[in-house]
Amino acid sequence: MSKIAVYPGSFDPITMGHVDIINRISPLYDEVIVLVAQSSQKQSMFSVEERKTLIEKALSHLKNVKVDIFGGLTVEYMKKAKAQVIVRGLRAVSDFEYEMTMANMNRKLAPDFETLLVFASPEFYYISSRGVKEVAINGGALKGLVPDVVVEAMENKIRK
């Protein structure tokens, strides 16, 4: 049986913190699925299709990583994908409470799945998608905060 992990999120946009976590977990699994959440509750800078494309370009160096879009419960997607592990990143202590609640909810819904919490590397712990959007909107430098392909896409989006 293949070891498959799912890393769900909105990834609007994918940041270097996300890329770092994916780089670090990809050697641990046969397949890592970056699952782009389709949410009508959030105002997004990029459509889910644009996010999927940007992530694919940013992670093209990782051959065991694929990107997919899903609009339902992560555990339902995991059943279809035959995945065993949900990966979540932790930047700060404040993330822990939310992630613990979600992990326990997922365990209630699907007792066979595990949640792997991965601490952000120190050089990326301060980066968030929301913060990156603020920097972009206010004309700040995005280099090092997001992959180069995302820098270009964000600059083009803001110019419009």
Curated annotation (Swiss-Prot):
Protein name (Swiss-Prot/TrEMBL): Phosphopantetheine adenylyltransferase
Question: Record's family?
Answer: Belongs to the bacterial CoaD family.
User: Where does the record place it?
Assistant: Cytoplasm
What gene does the UniProt entry assign to this protein? Answer: coaD
Highest taxon above the source species:
Bacteria
What Gene3D superfamilies does the record tag this protein with? HUPs
User: Where does the chain bind substrate?
Assistant: 10, 42, 74, 88
SUPFAM superfamilies in UniProt: Nucleotidylyl transferase (SSF52374)
Instruction: Output the CDD domains linked to this UniProt entry.
Output: PPAT
A GO cellular component annotated for this chain's UniProt record is: cytoplasm
Role:
Reversibly transfers an adenylyl group from ATP to 4'-phosphopantetheine, yielding dephospho-CoA (dPCoA) and pyrophosphate.
Listed cofactors: Mg(2+)
In which broad location class does this protein mainly occur, judging by the first location in its UniProt entry? cytoplasm
